[in-house]
Amino acid sequence: MRFFGKFIKRNYDPKTDSDVLFSLSSAYLTLESKIGLKNSGRCALSLKSISGMYFNEMKEDIKRFLDISKTDFELAYRTVTDSYGYLWVILEGKRMEDLLAGISAVGDTIDEKGFSNQLLAAVFEFTNDRNKKQYLIYNYKRNSFYPFVPVDGSQKTRNTEEEMKMMATIGDEVPLEKDMTLWYPLWDLPL
C-alpha cells in the first residue's frame, strides 16, 4: 500500500508517526547535554473523545495493552479527560525509550482502530536546572515536533527565547515544524 501511496498522495511522507517519534530517542540526550533539559519521565498522548461503542472499545484495548506491557516497558499510566473533552493517556517511566515505545504503541492502536483523525498530539515533558517545565509536542496532523515553554505564574505567556533554543538544539535530529504559527500552545497540560 505504501508503494501505491506515493502515486496517489501528493504529500507522501515515508516516515510514519512511530519513525518520527523514535527520532526523539537520541535528541533527548542532545537536549540534556547541550542545554541541560532532562527528561522528566512523563509524556502524554491526546485525542478528541467521541461517544460510541467502538471508541470505548479502543480505550479498553489501550488500557489492556498498557496493563500487559507495564513490566516490559516499566511504565505507569493513567487517563484523564480535560475540560475541552480531550482524552489524555499519560505515561510515566524512567527511560525515554520506554516512554517512546509506549506512546508509539498507543498511537498505533488508535490508528489501527480507525481513530487516527482524533489524534491531537504527543507531549514530552522536560525540566531545566531550575525545575521549570518545558515541552516538546508532536503534532500528528503535521508529522512534526515543536517546542512549548510556558512562563510560570503568567496569564498564558510563552517563553519564545527558550522555545527557539530548543528548536536550534535539536533541529537536525527531529523533524520540526518550521511555521511558528502552527506551534499551538497546550495550556494546563495534565502531566
List each model region and its residues.
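Charge-rich, low-complexity segments
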Residues: M1-N56, F148, K156-L191
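Generic detector of well-ordered alpha-helical segments enriched in charged/polar residues
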Residues: G5, D19-F22, N56-K63, L100, ...
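A glycine-rich, hydrophobic loop/mini-helix early in the fold
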Residues: S33-W88
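Short, flexible loop/turn elements at secondary-structure junctions
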Residues: S51, G93-R95, R142
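Extracellular/secreted glycoprotein ectodomains characterized by long, lumenal stretches
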Residues: S69, R95-G107, G114-N117, S144-F145
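Extracellular-facing segments of soluble proteins and assemblies that are Gly/Ser/Thr-biased and enriched
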Residues: Y77-D108
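Helix-rich interaction surfaces within compact, conserved domain-sized segments
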Residues: D111-P185
